């Protein structure tokens, strides 16, 4: 875990942006982009985006999509994912899961919610096409 934290700390060179979604008095969730790095050696131009997802108790992320595939690492709490055509899965602190654009994560076919009594934090690594 120490090497993971050290690696994350070294890769976090600047805050590239952030987003927050909330409706009325619903619990909030916020994703903060920690870094974006151009990647070579792939067909096309891609960036690796690292985002910290911070979810308040009871927060829900509506159906959505991502531009590219990515690995998720649950740092704290638990997140329940409703996958397309499958039952839900809950991932607790210390576990990982993978989301791939178009397969288990088509547009409007996946949602998430904080499954913990407290705050949930998920580190998201995404491989996105460069715009």
Q: Could you describe each region identified by the protein language model?
A:
Residues 9-18:
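Bacterial N-terminal signal peptides
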Residues 45, 65, 73, 90, ...:
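Extracellular/periplasmic catalytic domains that process cell-envelope and extracellular macromolecules
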Residues 28-62, 120, 125:
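A short glycine-rich, His/Asp/Glu-containing loop-to-beta-strand
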């Amino acid at each position: 875990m120490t090497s993971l934290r050290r690696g994350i700390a070294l890769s976090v060179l600047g805050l590239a942006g952030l987003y927050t979604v909330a409706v009325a008095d619903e619990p909030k969730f916020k994703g903060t982009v920690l870094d974006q790095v151009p990647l070579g050696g792939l067909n096309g131009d891609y960036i690796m985006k690292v985002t910290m997802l911070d979810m308040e108790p009871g927060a829900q992320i509506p159906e959505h999509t991502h531009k590219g595939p990515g690995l998720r690492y649950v740092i704290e709490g638990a997140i329940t994912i409703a996958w397309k055509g499958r039952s839900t899965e809950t991932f607790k602190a210390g576990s990982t899961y993978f989301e791939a654009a178009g397969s288990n994560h088509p547009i409007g076919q996946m949602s998430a919610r904080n499954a913990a009594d407290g705050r949930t934090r998920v580190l998201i690594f995404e491989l996105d096409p460069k715009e």
